[in-house]
Amino acid sequence: MPKRLSGLQKEVLHLYRASIRTAHTKPKENQVNFVNYIHEEFGKYRNLPRKDFTTIEHLLRVGNKKIATFSHPELTNIH
């Protein structure tokens, strides 16, 4: 039986999926750049302790702001 996810884990997963969905709204030739950036950003904090709630909440706020920025149609590429 799979382990149930906590509220923060669900929020992180939602942020990741929303980020990938946003990346797929960009031009085909630049989507890989966005997806690579997302993987790098999430990978940086992969080993963050699950009990470090304040850091996780801060990173969620920062991530949501980045999604809002990346969702603008004027932004077509990221390096």
Swiss-Prot record:
The answer to whether keyword Thylakoid applies is: no
| Residues spanning the signal sequence | none
| Keyword annotations | Chaperone, Mitochondrion
Q: What happens on changing residue 61 to P?
A: Abolishes the ability to complement a yeast strain carrying a deletion for this gene
Q: Does the keyword Mitochondrion apply?
A: yes
Q: What is the effect of changing residue 63 to R?
A: Abolishes the ability to complement a yeast strain carrying a deletion for this gene
* Disruption phenotype annotation: OXPHOS incompetent because of a profound and specific reduction of complex II activity.
- Name one process (GO BP) from the record: iron-sulfur cluster assembly
Kindly list the places in or outside the cell where this protein is found, as annotated in its UniProt entry.
Mitochondrion matrix
Could you state one GO cellular component term attached to this entry?
Answer: mitochondrion
**Its biological function?**
Plays an essential role in the assembly of succinate dehydrogenase (SDH), an enzyme complex (also referred to as respiratory complex II) that is a component of both the tricarboxylic acid (TCA) cycle and the mitochondrial electron transport chain, and which couples the oxidation of succinate to fumarate with the reduction of ubiquinone (coenzyme Q) to ubiquinol. Promotes maturation of the iron-sulfur protein subunit SDH2 of the SDH catalytic dimer, protecting it from the deleterious effects of oxidants. Acts together with SDHAF3 (SDH7).
Entry's PANTHER family? Answer: LYR MOTIF-CONTAINING PROTEIN 2, SUCCINATE DEHYDROGENASE ASSEMBLY FACTOR 1, MITOCHONDRIAL
Q: Which family does it belong to?
A: Belongs to the complex I LYR family. SDHAF1 subfamily.
How does the record describe its quaternary structure? Interacts with SDH2 within an SDH1-SDH2 subcomplex.
Further remarks about this protein from its record: Present with 861 molecules/cell in log phase SD medium.
This protein is called Succinate dehydrogenase assembly factor 1, mitochondrial
Question: Which organism encodes this protein?
Answer: Saccharomyces cerevisiae (strain ATCC 204508 / S288c)
Q: Which lineage ranks, top first, belong to the organism behind this chain?
A: Eukaryota, Fungi, Dikarya, Ascomycota, Saccharomycotina
UniProt lists the gene as SDH6
